[in-house]
Amino acid sequence: MSRVAKAPVSIPASVEVKLDGQLLTVKGKNGELSRTIHNSVEVKQDNNQLTFSPRVGIANADAQSGTARALVNAMVIGVNEGFTKKLQLVGVGYRAQMKGNVLVLSLGFSHPIDHVLPAGVTAECPSQTEIVLKSADKQLIGQVAADIRAYRRPEPYKGKGVRYADEVVRMKEAKKK
């Protein structure tokens, strides 16, 4: 059995979990998330805990049980507390601003980039060089942050580009004559 799957997922009082066959729905103050659990994983709900165990005789059942436990734990944390990702824009003239549900980025191209945020993700710009993303869905917020970063990755000579707030960009030395 997976080491991750051995630990049960504790459910806070403010979170409601509904298990319907292999479909697990988690409801909290930040919204509602649902996910289909793999057939090789058996889920049991006891009071305020969810336990995950692999079904016997199925290949990869151990790995799937650990994965399912980690995904459901992220869902419970997301609907209860939510997730945030911070991005920084480094470079002369690099700016970000919100216009409704659209994030407008000026990243040194000849045109501004309009990035439409998907449902479930909100963004705010405390300054022109900072973007703060908030969502209950950990996978979705990570994908949106990666998409925004992909427009202009940090380059290794000057460090210009879009980076995560906690990202350390390894700098190269310029060519010497």
Swiss-Prot record:
Q: Tell me the leader sequence span.
A: none
For this UniProt record, the keywords arranged alphabetically read as follows: Ribonucleoprotein, Ribosomal protein, RNA-binding, rRNA-binding
Recorded GO cellular component terms are: cytosolic large ribosomal subunit
Q: What biological-process GO terms show up in the record?
A: cytoplasmic translation
GO function terms (MF aspect):
rRNA binding; structural constituent of ribosome
Q: Which Gene3D superfamilies match?
A: Ribosomal protein L6, alpha-beta domain (3.90.930.12)
Q: Do you know which Pfam families this protein is assigned to?
A: Ribosomal_L6
Q: Which InterPro entries match?
A: Ribosomal_uL6-like, Ribosomal_uL6-like_a/b-dom_sf, Ribosomal_uL6_a/b-dom, Ribosomal_uL6_bac-type, Ribosomal_uL6_CS
User: Does this entry carry the keyword rRNA-binding?
Assistant: yes
Query: Does this entry carry the keyword Ribonucleoprotein?
Result: yes
- Assembly and oligomerization: Part of the 50S ribosomal subunit.
Instruction: State the PANTHER family in the record.
Output: 60S/50S RIBOSOMAL PROTEIN L6/L9, LARGE RIBOSOMAL SUBUNIT PROTEIN UL6M
What HAMAP family is this protein classified in?
Ribosomal_uL6_B (MF_01365_B)
What's the stated role of this polypeptide?
Answer: This protein binds to the 23S rRNA, and is important in its secondary structure. It is located near the subunit interface in the base of the L7/L12 stalk, and near the tRNA binding site of the peptidyltransferase center.
Give the similarity note: Belongs to the universal ribosomal protein uL6 family.
Name of this protein: Large ribosomal subunit protein uL6
Query: Which source organism does the UniProt entry give?
Result: Histophilus somni (strain 129Pt) (Haemophilus somnus)
Identify the gene encoding this protein: rplF
